[in-house]
Amino acid sequence: MTTKTMRAIFTPQALAAAVALGCCAQAQAVAFNIGEIEGTFDSSLSVGASWGMRDADKSLVGTVNGGTGQSSTGDDGRLNFKKGETFSKIVKGIHDLELKYGDTGVFVRGKYWYDFELKDEDREFKPISDKGRKEGAKSSGAQILDAFVYHNYSIADLPGTVRAGKQVVSWGESTFIGNSINSINPIDVSAFRRPGAEIKEGLIPVNMLFGSQGLTDQFTVEGFYQLEWDQTVLDNCGTFFGVDVAADGCNNGYTVGNPAIAPLVPLTTAFGQGIQVTREGVVIPRGGDRDARDSGQWGTALRWLGDDTEYGLYFMNYHSRTPTVGTTTAGLSTLAALPGMVGIANGLAPGSGSGLAQSVMLGRGGYYLEYPEDIRLYGASFSTTLPTGTAWTGEISYRPNAPVQVNTNDLTLALLNPIAGGTASPIATTPGSDNKGYRRKEVTQIQSTLTHFFDQVWGAQRLTLVGEAAVVRVGGLESRSKLRYGRDSVYGQYGFGGDTDGFVTSTSWGYRARAILDYANVIGGINLKPNLSWSHDVAGYGPNGLFNEGAKAISVGVDADYRNTYTASLSYTDFFGGDYNVLEDRDFVALSFGVNF
């Protein structure tokens, strides 16, 4: 259950957004009574599968694994699945229970899943493990999602509601594009990857207090205070969309350098500076995650309903739900041991000392994931209907201290600065120090959405068109010769092969669009919804992967349902375009069947 004001829930704009996101009507929930307690129980069961439709792009695979890319930290998922192979084969269920006594109630939602492909099948390149993973990233599991109590009341005939417990609160008017005002809850990325996924499966409820109170017939104030912090669930390493180094428990995938140094590993151990070398290179050890604290997350909103338009003002203080990557430079003891190791290495294999020194500095360094705290967000939104019947919404958000990820190649090369006279990376470092993976920047984002319904089109009862565009401005960026942000490590360090593009720019923009045709009662009560989705990052490179110039995606699909009870969905998604698009070889087909009761 997503928490919004009652007024917001029933606006045409909210309905249009739900349609655009592909939400379909559920069958009538099972209703029951226990004395004066009213209850409903709603269930969805589904089976599905997904297949990869392209071979791995060699330019996105590291050289140590037969490709031409400058990093191997994204190789596991690419080399685990060939073209045409199944990368997910899943059965899952989700259940909602609501109990009401007068104006007071309890809502609980839970889900479970089992992916036979990831759980039971062997992988060609590297095994996929659930050990140490977040529950949502595992190949099989069960979770309680929402679990809260609520009470509806009136003060002087002005409605109000309070909620306490695990819940989702949605603010703002964003439909497709992230980094918006709607940043209260983290996302379960793994859940959204599964065939047949529903919106409610991928939003992570968080323990919080929420309240909404009408001040007049036109003004409503809302607020929340989170009782805990939680993080976005990332794809498990080795899965089709996963990277090797980010998810919880993926601790040995940050490999760099030349694996040919392996014969000299015993020498490093003898000097008390042992390192780990695999077939992919030197392992940079993962340190403990720097999780955000539970306290200090709160927000307030003021809504004004005019004659034809609803306006909103927002403020939030929250901690990042997505991680930044930082590194830790090897300590003084490692530097002190280097001359002895290098001398012996050169005696054993002339010229090998330099490579050994670099490998030791990398292998005795480390990396960590950090979740920056106390991000401030100021926002404003509007929602209206134009004379044409088109729903028009928009919002602006401003974060004066948003964390922006520093280029990870520069962070890795910073580990070599103590033996390179500070010239390996523009990031200054000292032995034993942390190299913070982000800098705080002013980030402003403006976005707008149009939704229109056309009746009786191409034999369909309705055609729904939704389009959303956004522009992002990042203030205070340094020149690229001083510090770079963003860009995947597979493209190498700044200036490699003369390439100096692809890093975060001060301005970036893109748009998303979706079209849905509704064919009712096509054959024997079966309803069909052919749909087309389009994504285009037009210009610039946004912070933290928001926009990637030239990157495009198209998805063609059809959804079917019978009496709002039995469902089926088939879609094909193609990623293409852009010079720095790591998704361009991740095309896939998804098929699912479900039942709602």
Model-derived features with residue positions:
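Short loop/turn motifs that connect adjacent beta-strands in outer-membrane beta-barrel proteins
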Residues: 28-41, 54-56, 97-106, 150-163, ...
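Membrane-embedded beta-strand positions in outer-membrane beta-barrel channels/transporters
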Residues: 40, 92-96, 146-148, 208, ...
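Solvent-exposed loop segments that connect transmembrane elements
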Residues: 57-78, 119-135, 185-194, 235-286, ...
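Short sequence motifs at beta-strands and strand-loop junctions characteristic
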Residues: 84-89, 136-141, 198-203, 290-294, ...
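Detector for outer-membrane/organellar transmembrane beta-barrel domains
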Residues: 86-90, 316-318, 323, 393, ...
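Outer membrane beta-barrel
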Residues: 100-251, 510, 539, 547-552, ...
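Outer-membrane beta-barrel "beta-signal"
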Residues: 585-597
